[in-house]
Amino acid sequence: MGAATKLAFAVFLISCSSAGSILGRSETKECIYYNANWEKDKTNSNGTEICYGDNDKRKHCFATWKNISGSIEIVKQGCWLDDINCYNKSKCTEKKDSPDVFFCCCEGNYCNEKFYHSPEMEVTQPTSNPVTTKPPLFNTLLYSLVPIMVVAVIVLFSFWMYRHHKLAYPPVLVPTQDPGPPPPSPLLGLKPLQLLEVKARGRFGCVWKAQLLNETVAVKIFPVQDKLSWQNEYEIYSLPGMKHENILYFIGAEKRGTNLDTDLWLITAFHEKGSLTDYLKANVVSWNELCLIAETMARGLSHLHEDIPGLKDGHKPAVAHRDIKSKNVLLKNNLTACIADFGLALKFEAGKSAGDTHGQVGTRRYMAPEVLEGAINFQRDAFLRIDMYAFGLVLWELASRCTASDGPVDEYMLPFEEEVGQHPSLEDMQEVVVHKKKRPILRECWQKHAGMAMLCETIEECWDHDAEARLSAGCVEERIIQMQKLTNIITTEDIVTVVTMVTNVDFPPKESSL
């Protein structure tokens, strides 16, 4: 074997070794676990943690610590979800100069056992894990092989970038530049979060009213078996452009506990009035209140459905909610609405199909005819039209509790409650909606109010049996604005007419008292 051949063979071996180490870093299966607040969080204080995650997501280890006058205090160590800032980092290194709380992440089993601060490159770790001194031979080999390894790493990194693009990893979510809380991170666990009372229970868990420092927040707690719903909701909230006044305000996400005792938390803004369902059960609404709720609800759904390129924080894809109902619309103190609960939501990105997404999801009562039939066209517009059918039913719920018309206001009922009761089966809904093509009743007295008559027409165009004939959320928003303007004009004209009639009356002259 010639000298050139030997050299090529050596470079090949080094390249393979480098490739193995680089590709191996993404195979993080276990991390060192530590929680300084273990007593309060009711978890283990230290040990190891198995990292769970989807096959197409990368897993990392992380560490957070404080440096108080040269004394290192570890706050948390454990597993960390897919984050581009952690890719291909075998060492857990903080690069900021002097943060209040140091944070680093890395790839590789137990890579967070030791952690570093890059300006000084000092190893900061528990006293039980002393730094091991590298032998001189190791340093000699390292410095001599650096040039060759750099070339090998560049080649392999280029190949990895090509594969990364080809396999179409989900886009990494960067923090939005809109004002508001930072994206979810383990540092949220440093703030005292106290659960106060259960406010609601649903398919994927329960919602608590909680106290975060001086702020009242909502905490949605998922059991570990509903991790996919928690992860999907977290990813939807973290998309660029999702900070909107009519979409529930997202604060952060956390994993509490270990192994089978793990709970998954989503922390959002808290709204005391609760859901639209709860509000309509206890209250009637005026015409102006109906318009305010309906307009802001439509505005939130329109923003969710919209594909918006060129935002400062990236491209916002169109998102279908897939579980629109009055229970998932929350009311703020001023009665403006915000859309909540994205556990079933689906995002649509250019060049990607909906794939194997199961179409028959959501709440049966609000399922569109095509969903009940299982005849869904798995394209973006089809899913958005399914949302609009359910939106029409929510508008009907609002109309049923409005005092604008002269007729009586009925007790609150869910859509189709008269026909199928409170717990319909899939077959019940198929019979009523698909075969009989029934819809909730639009009262005759509603037609006598100009605004309510236009609202009834809008509702019918939202729940049309032909999906392609349904209105968009943006169109509904514009219609509601026009409805309110029209009724204001009519009211003003009526007042002018009455005043004119009164001023044109010939009153008899007053008799003199003299």
From Swiss-Prot:
Keywords for the protein's UniProt record, in alphabetical order: ATP-binding, Cell membrane, Disulfide bond, Glycoprotein, Kinase, Membrane, Nucleotide-binding, Receptor, Serine/threonine-protein kinase, Signal, Transferase, Transmembrane, Transmembrane helix
Highest rank taxon of the organism: Eukaryota
Predominant cellular place of this UniProt entry's protein: membrane
Glycosylation sites: N46, N67, N88
Topological type in the membrane: Single-pass type I membrane protein
EC number(s) per entry: 2.7.11.30
Enzyme class: transferase
GO terms under biological process: activin receptor signaling pathway; cellular response to growth factor stimulus; pattern specification process
Sequence intervals crossing the membrane: 137-162
Stretch forming the signal peptide: 1-20
Gene Ontology molecular function, alphabetical: activin binding; activin receptor activity; ATP binding
Residue ranges annotated for the Protein kinase domain, each copy included: 193-486
One Pfam entry name: Activin_recp
Cytoplasmic side: 163-514
Matches recorded under Gene3D superfamilies: CD59, Phosphorylase Kinase, domain 1, Transferase(Phosphotransferase) domain 1
Active site: residue positions: D323
Disulfide bonds: C31-C61, C51-C79, C86-C105, C92-C104, C106-C111
Localization: Cell membrane
InterPro entries according to UniProt: Activin_recp, Kinase-like_dom_sf, Prot_kinase_dom, Ser/Thr_kinase_AS, Snake_toxin-like_sf, TGFB_receptor
GO cellular component, one term: plasma membrane
CDD domains according to UniProt: STKc_ACVR2a (cd14141), TFP_LU_ECD_ACVR2A (cd23631)
UniProt topological domain (Extracellular) ranges: 21-136
Catalytic activity: L-threonyl-[receptor-protein] + ATP = O-phospho-L-threonyl-[receptor-protein] + ADP + H(+); L-seryl-[receptor-protein] + ATP = O-phospho-L-seryl-[receptor-protein] + ADP + H(+)
Binding, ATP: K199, A200, R201, G202, R203, F204, G205, C206, V207, K220
Function of the molecule: Receptor for activin A, activin B and inhibin A. Involved in transmembrane signaling.
Name of protein: Activin receptor type-2A
Protein species of origin: Xenopus laevis (African clawed frog)
